[in-house]
C-alpha cells in the first residue's frame, strides 16, 4: 500500500463519518486500483511506450456518492436507495485511467437536490471550519475531507452550485467547468481542491503568468431571491474589486441581468427531473416530484426554452469578460436549519442563501469560488468571455500564493 493510502486509512479510522465525510471507504479496493496501475505502468515500460504514469497518478480522489464506481455501493443520498454498482461513471473512469485512486464515496444529500448535505439514513457531515454548521451541498462530504486535509482533491458535481457552495462554506476552492446545457441540463462534473494550484491541476488548466486587461463586472445585487447580504460578504467583494482595479483591469458595477422567469424555469426543471424518482423520498424531494407531475407539456417546452436562453440574456445584459460577486449571502447556517422548514420554505431559503450560483448552471459558463483573505469571505468569479485559464489567472491575482491554504 502506498504511503498516501496508509496515511488516509489511519486518519479516517480516527474520525467519525460526520468528521471524515465518507459514505463508504474501502482501502482494499484502493490498494487493488494502485496495484493494477503499477502493473499497467510496468507493462508500458516493457513495451517501451512513451506513456507510463498518468496525469493524476498519485492523486487520491474520492467519488461523490451520486456517481457509480464498479464494486462500490451507491446510495444516491438515501440509504434505502443503496445498490451495488457494476459499472463506473464515465467521468470517474477517466480519472482512473489517468492514474487517480478512488478509495470510496463521499456523503451527499438525496439525489443532490439540496445546497446542504443531510442524506437520509446516513451521517450528516459537519463543517470542520465552523463546527455544528453545514458544509454546504450537494458535495458536502467531499468538501469536508478536502477542508480537513484528508485528500488534496475530491470529485464533485454542480447542478445549482453544488461544487461552489461547499467550497465557499469550508474555505477551499471549487471550480464548475463550462458544460453543455442541451435539453436544459444544469449539471457539470468537476472537483473540490484545497488550493488554487491543485484546483487548476485536477481540472487540467494551465494558469497563465499574467492575464490581459479585462472588463470585470461587479454584481452585489441578489439575482434569484430577495435577501439582505451580510456586510462582510459585500466588503470582501468590494476589496477584491479594488485589487483587480489596481492590477489594471476595468472594473464596473452591473445590475441583475434578467427578471424572475429564468429562475422560475430552473425551479420547474428541477421539479421535472424529479418526476421519475421512485419510492419514498425526503420531504423536499417528494415536494419537487409532486410539483413536477403537475407541469404540463406546454409549460415544459416553455421552461426549456427559457432555461436555454439564459446564456444569451447574460451576455446581452453585461458587456464584461468576468463577473465578480459574493457566493453566499450569509454564513453557513447550523445543520438542520433548512430541513426543519416546510419543503417550499426550505427551497426558497436555500435560494436566499445562494442567490447567484444557479445562473452559471443555466448559462453553462465556468465559475470559480475561493476564499478571499480568510475562509469567512468566499468570492465567486464567473467566465463570461474568457477561457478557463484566464479565469484562473484572475483568481490567482486575488488568491495570492496559489499553493497556500487560506485559514481563519
Predicted feature descriptions by range:
Residues 1-51, 205-354, 362, 400-408:
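Amidase signature
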Residues 31-56, 82-85, 114-135, 139:
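Flexible, acidic active-site loops/lids enriched in D/E/S/T/G that coordinate Mg2+ and/or position polar
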Residues 47-70, 102-105, 323-327:
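ATP-grasp fold ATP-binding core
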Residues 55-91:
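Enzymes and membrane/adaptor proteins characterized by extended Gly/Ser/Thr/Asp/Glu-rich
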Residues 80-86, 129-133, 343-355:
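A short acidic, glycine-rich active-site loop
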Residues 87-203, 366-378:
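Short glycine/serine-rich loop segments
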Residues 94, 143-145, 243, 358-361:
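Hydrophobic/aromatic ligand-binding patch that stacks against planar heteroaromatic rings
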Residues 375-393:
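Short, well-ordered beta-strand elements
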